[in-house]
């Protein structure tokens, strides 16, 4: 499966931005038809969809689109963009599972990624994630979320810490991937720090609004396969000696961490050697 570490929102009708996005290295490119595309430009953005998705795929990215809620102009968005065969359809401002079921009916046969942008949506995350079998992930917003909470966005992101942790837990419990909120400031250092915080919490994917951040954030979310191999080797050696724990880089390695390292290697197409049997 192609990597999905970074999900870049791109203005729907800005052809220069479309070309820049194709060069930036983000894994998933999203033609954004909501906030990034003023209503007068949406017809133009819809007309660009088909050729745009082909160009993005030729550049090695997954081609996605974010449509407006169906109760506004989302159905008009879908009627146009589905002809371009996007790989993924995202929908903004999903607060309840009923919206997902309506989207699934309106967009048959394509992967769905609902976007959670309000307190109500956050409280319904588990139900939203289980609303349809074609849901590949959920994405949590930043700007709309802080507005709904009645606060403001900061570089440190303290105001969203609980939201991001709660969202990840709900998604994990539902068995779907969680895409972290974008860092909406321009500085690269802050973007990397924000991505590292998300990675430490357990996120494996992050949304972006600045294409210049893509390569650095990709590095943060690229699995450390070398360390996974060391973990497996050390634990297997310990197990062969009759122990159920080992140490790697000073860290205690027990069965859950060992099992996660094996899964990581298998998912990367580098299966570890067969498990050694414990002595005795």
Cite the ranges covered by each PLM segment.
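Expand to "…catalyze enediolate/carbanion chemistry for C-C bond making/breaking, isomerization
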Residues: 1-280
């Amino acid at each position: 499966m192609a990597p999905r570490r970074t999900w870049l929102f791109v203005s729907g009708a800005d052809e220069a931005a479309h070309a820049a996005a194709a060069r930036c290295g983000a894994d998933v490119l999203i033609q954004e038809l909501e906030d990034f595309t003023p209503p007068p430009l949406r017809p133009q953005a819809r007309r660009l969809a088909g050729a745009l998705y082909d160009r993005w795929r030729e550049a090695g990215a997954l081609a996605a689109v974010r449509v407006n809620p169906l109760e506004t102009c989302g159905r008009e968005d879908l009627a146009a963009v589905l002809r371009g065969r996007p790989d993924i359809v995202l929908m903004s401002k999903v607060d309840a599972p009923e919206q997902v079921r309506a989207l699934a009916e309106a967009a048959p046969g394509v992967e769905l990624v609902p976007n959670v942008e309000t307190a109500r949506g956050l409280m319904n995350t588990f139900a939203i994630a289980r609303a349809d079998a074609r849901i590949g992930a959920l994405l949590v917003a930043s700007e709309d979320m802080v507005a709904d909470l009645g606060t403001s966005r900061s570089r440190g992101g303290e105001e969203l810490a609980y939201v991001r942790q709660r969202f990840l837990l709900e998604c994990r419990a539902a068995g779907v991937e969680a895409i972290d909120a974008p860092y909406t400031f321009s500085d690269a250092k802050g973007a990397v720090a924000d991505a590292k915080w998300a990675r430490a919490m357990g996120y494996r994917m992050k949304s972006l609004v600045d294409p210049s951040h893509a390569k650095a954030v990709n590095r943060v979310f690229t699995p450390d396969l070398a360390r996974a191999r060391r973990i497996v080797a050390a634990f297997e050696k310990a197990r062969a000696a009759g122990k159920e724990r080992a140490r790697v880089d000073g860290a205690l390695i027990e069965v859950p961490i060992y099992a996660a390292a094996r899964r990581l290697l298998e998912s990367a197409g580098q299966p570890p050697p067969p498990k050694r049997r414990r002595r005795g």
